[in-house]
């Protein structure tokens, strides 16, 4: 299954990715090994959970979880293009002891982190019941120093952030992973992405393998436009509807910033690029570059990719 996953990513539009793997150390390292050989650049997280999770994936206790996490980090240091990332599944699945421990490991090895935030109302309610002394979900991560500010941090979904939490996203330089298809499939809600972008918050796109039907980030870009129309129609008539420029930005520079100077053809940026031949798409007239990109967002055909580069290196499929 890992080979299928890696092959699918290689043939698609993605050059860099951050992944939630599994809660099993050896399996996570195997995925990292395969991604290391792919030519892509990636972060892969060992998913932490020691409570409120099925026994088949839950660690026996926080001590065992922390031991396995450090072993995974040390083993992963041998890789060059695939790096570890601290990955608590989300607050309800991690005890305070586990959160404290992985926070210390993050500091010890100077790692980024990733998790979920404000995906659905029941999850938020559970967090506020489990964690004492917090006013919102974000403060639960801040409590354990796993909410950016001093390190790169991805938070998936961010559907129900309060105004205060939106300010925290900006202040602490959080990277929001917008997963529109997942939010639809799980009936989670619609994130106010145009508000985030207009406030200068980092926003990239996620496929959310479990609740999404495709790994394609371009497909997610199209879906981001579509769900923003539903947000305008059913949630907030004052909200700005996303356009193709917003979507293309999130699919490139918006997510690329997490990896450094990535996602733009500017001087000093690393060369991640796709060579695309769209001449086979039937056309009744000539299109501008902007129109061709917008058309690509809606057609999303990997067969149009002629060549793919990551950090200047040709990806061989």
Predicted region positions:
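Divalent metal-binding segments
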Residues: 1-27, 88, 92-98
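Short, surface-exposed connector motifs at secondary-structure boundaries
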Residues: 8-17, 80-85, 144-152, 173-177, ...
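Divalent metal-coordination and catalytic microenvironments
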Residues: 13, 35, 86, 116, ...
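Metal-coordinating catalytic core of metallo-dependent amide/deamination hydrolases
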Residues: 28-159
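Short, acidic/turn-prone active-site loops that include or flank metal/cofactor-
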Residues: 47-50, 119, 180-185, 209-211
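His/Asp/Glu-enriched, well-ordered alpha-helical/loop segment
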Residues: 143-149, 193-282
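A conserved active-site cap/scaffold subdomain adjacent to cofactor or substrate pockets
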Residues: 161-164, 170-201, 205-207
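C-terminal cap of metal-dependent C-N hydrolases
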Residues: 270-317
């Amino acid at each position: 299954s890992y080979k299928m996953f890696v092959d699918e990513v290689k043939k698609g539009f993605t050059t860099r990715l951050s992944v939630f793997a599994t809660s099993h150390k050896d399996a996570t390292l195997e995925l990292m090994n395969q991604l290391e050989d792919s030519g892509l650049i990636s972060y892969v997280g060992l998913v932490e959970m020691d409570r409120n999770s099925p026994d088949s994936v839950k660690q026996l206790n926080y001590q065992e979880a922390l031991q396995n996490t450090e072993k995974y980090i040390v083993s992963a240091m041998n890789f060059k293009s695939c790096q570890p990332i601290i990955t608590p599944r989300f607050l309800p699945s991690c005890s305070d002891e586990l959160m404290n421990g992985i926070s210390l490991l993050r500091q010890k090895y100077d790692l980024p982190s990733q998790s979920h935030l404000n995906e659905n109302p029941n999850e938020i309610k559970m967090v506020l019941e489990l964690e004492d002394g917090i006013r919102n979900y974000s403060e639960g991560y801040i409590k354990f120093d796993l909410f950016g500010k001093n390190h790169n941090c991805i938070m998936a979904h961010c559907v129900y952030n309060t105004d205060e939490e939106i300010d925290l996203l900006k202040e602490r330089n959080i990277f929001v992973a917008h997963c529109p298809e997942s939010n639809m499939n799980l009936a989670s809600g619609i994130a106010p992405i145009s508000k985030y972008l207009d406030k200068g918050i980092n926003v990239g796109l996620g496929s959310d393998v479990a609740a999404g039907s495709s790994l394609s980030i371009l497909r997610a870009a199209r879906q981001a436009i579509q769900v923003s129309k539903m947000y305008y129609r059913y949630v907030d008539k004052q909200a700005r509807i996303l356009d193709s420029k917003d979507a293309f930005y999130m699919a490139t520079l918006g997510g690329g910033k997490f990896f450094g100077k990535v996602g733009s053809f500017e001087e000093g940026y690393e060369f991640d690029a796709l060579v695309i031949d769209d001449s086979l798409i039937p056309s009744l007239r000539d299109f501008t570059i902007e129109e061709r990109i917008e058309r690509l967002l809606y057609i999303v055909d990997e067969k149009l990719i002629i060549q793919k580069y990551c950090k200047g290196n040709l990806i061989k499929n």
